[in-house]
């Protein structure tokens, strides 16, 4: 509803994370994309300088087999931070998600088509775990913590300014769509007792 006036006026907008947390809203955004409306959304974690060297570049670790991310606060608002920490590293291709936790302690397992198992521990009061990721491969492993939030937020805003100037989205819509599927499915899995949710690959 907050986006509607800008969408109707064809004003390009940046929508703070997460874009949405349910499939009904996601389909509205999909409709707007199909109509050529202009908006983007992302988490600043995508732009953390500590993670950037590993964006689609983990050759020294061999084939990635396991990724672990820790995050504080709620899955609904901060799960996207964890997901968007991982996404530029492993790329698209998430197959399933399972959340065996509860509203305060989201313990999430995801499977990726590249043969990677990913765990996210999104625990409400675990502030010490914010922005910590472990990458384990067939040849090596590393743990990284993001600390320079100024850099991440600045680069995120720069990406929006560039979008306004060029019309080129910094993140392809299909990636944003997949991320929002994961946010929504993580909630659905938890609310249904921890069942595994397989992603719909139609989009």
Residue ranges and their predicted role:
Residues 26, 51, 82-83, 153, ...:
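A general structural signal for well-ordered alpha-helical segments in protein cores
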Residues 64-129, 174-181:
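Rossmann-like dinucleotide-binding domain that binds NAD(P)(H)
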Residues 14, 19-77:
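A contiguous active-site-proximal alpha/beta segment in oxidoreductase catalytic domains
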Residues 1-15:
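Rossmann-fold NAD(P) dinucleotide-binding segment
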Residues 3, 29, 54, 159-160, ...:
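Generic hydrophobic alpha-helical segments
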Residues 10, 36, 193-194:
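Glycine-centered short loops/turns at secondary-structure junctions
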Residues 127-168:
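Interdomain hinge/lid region at the active-site interface
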Residues 4, 163-203:
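C-terminal helix-rich "cap/oligomerization" subdomain common to oxidoreductases
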């Amino acid at each position: 509803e907050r986006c509607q006036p800008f969408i109707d006026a064809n004003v390009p907008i940046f929508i703070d994370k997460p874009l949405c947390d349910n499939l009904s809203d996601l389909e509205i955004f999909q409709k707007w994309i199909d109509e050529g409306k202009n908006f983007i959304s992302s988490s600043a974690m995508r732009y953390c300088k500590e993670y950037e060297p590993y964006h689609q570049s983990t050759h020294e670790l061999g084939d990635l087999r396991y990724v672990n991310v820790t995050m504080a606060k709620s899955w609904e608002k901060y799960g996207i931070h964890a997901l968007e920490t991982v996404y530029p590293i492993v790329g698209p291709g998430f197959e399933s998600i399972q959340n065996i936790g509860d509203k305060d302690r989201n313990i999430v397992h995801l499977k990726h088509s590249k043969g990677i198992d990913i765990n996210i521990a999104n625990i409400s009061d675990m502030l010490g775990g914010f922005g910590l990721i472990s990458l384990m491969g067939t040849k090596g492993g590393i743990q990284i913590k993001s600390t320079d939030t100024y850099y991440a937020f600045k680069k995120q805003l720069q990406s929006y300014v560039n979008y306004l100037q060029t019309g080129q989205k910094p993140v392809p819509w299909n990636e944003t769509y997949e991320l929002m599927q994961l946010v929504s499915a993580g909630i659905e899995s938890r609310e249904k007792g921890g069942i595994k949710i397989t992603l719909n690959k139609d989009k």
